[in-house]
Amino acid sequence: MRFTRRRLLAGIGLAGLEAMMSPLAKEAGTFSSAARPAAEAGASTCPFRLAVINDEITQDFEKACQIVAEDFGLEWIELRSMWNKNVTELDAKQLDDARKILAAHKLRVTDIASPLFKTDWPGAPVSRQSERRDQFHADFDATAQDKLLERCISLAQTFETDRIRCFDFWRLDDPAPYRVAINAKLQQAARRCAKENLILLLENEMSCNTATGEESAAVLQAIPDKNFMLNWDPGNAAALGSTPYPDGYALLPKNRIGHCHCKDVIRKPDHKYKWAPVGGGIVDWVGQLQALHHDGFHYGLSLETHWRGAGTPEESTRISMDGLKKTLTRAGISC
């Protein structure tokens, strides 16, 4: 047998990650195409649209789709960037190529994971977060947001999904003076999406103005439009120091959760955070998944590991997906 880096990570090489991984994550192996029939059987009975954000694996879109479909046995994928370009900046040929690749692997798109409104709020003090510009090969200032929204609507139609992910501007030390105006902008965008029968998903993001369950609930209450929903990210909330489950989740209107991102996090003694494989951090994913299932959530449950402890995005995502599937099993959910 030829021992590759991936095989070593799936076996004894995982011991080197012990400092950051729980027993669940340490058990993680890798998926192979030989296991595809069993994986597909689980996918067909899964109550969620189990997915992965494509660029968490690789910028090679063909390879990412092959891994998602054949190795992970999934039917869904979330689109953010590929070929070192944000999905919102793909040209016509690249869009056509992407659609052909998706069709070849029989993958459906959960949503367009766009960078919409991940910028500074005009007129407010410049956010400390704005220097990071972590937008996955995209950088649109405030003046470009309306045009970006139209592009996202077009992409949703192209990829036959009804959901677009957005944010609510880089986090301010004191967003209160601007909150009403920010909400108005979000509502305006949601109503534009509604005209095309699309759902606008606000992600709670630690670098933006809505990060926790409490903040998410407040925005959802302020914007009652039914097609304005939450992309609930417990890992992001935990990174800011809150307890996403059960505390944050308890505050959320369950019928307004339209997507969920899966990642895990470790809080360090200096109160900073670092990412972990799913099941290897402080998020109570067993409880969270059970609650989502109990409350009738049946939309995208998408792995966005961010963790890179296995050396490469692909290897890290394989371990984190294995952790997610083991966590689903522990939660009594067949996927």
Task: Go through each PLM region and give its residues.
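Vicinal oxygen chelate
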Residues: 83, 87, 131-132, 169, ...
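Glycine-rich, proline-tolerant flexible connector loops at the mouths of alpha/beta enzymes
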Residues: 80-98, 102, 171-173
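Active-site acidic/histidine proton-transfer and metal-coordination neighborhood
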Residues: 13-20, 40-44, 66, 119-230, ...
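Glycine-rich, aromatic-flanked loop segments that form ligand/cofactor-binding clefts
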Residues: 106-122
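A non-catalytic, amphipathic alpha-helix used as a structural packing/dimerization or gating element
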Residues: 97, 101-104, 147-151, 184, ...
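Histidine-acidic metal/acid-base catalytic patches
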Residues: 2-23, 33-37, 43-51, 58-75, ...
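A cross-domain feature marking catalytic cores of carbohydrate-active enzymes
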Residues: 52-56, 79-83, 111-116, 166-168, ...
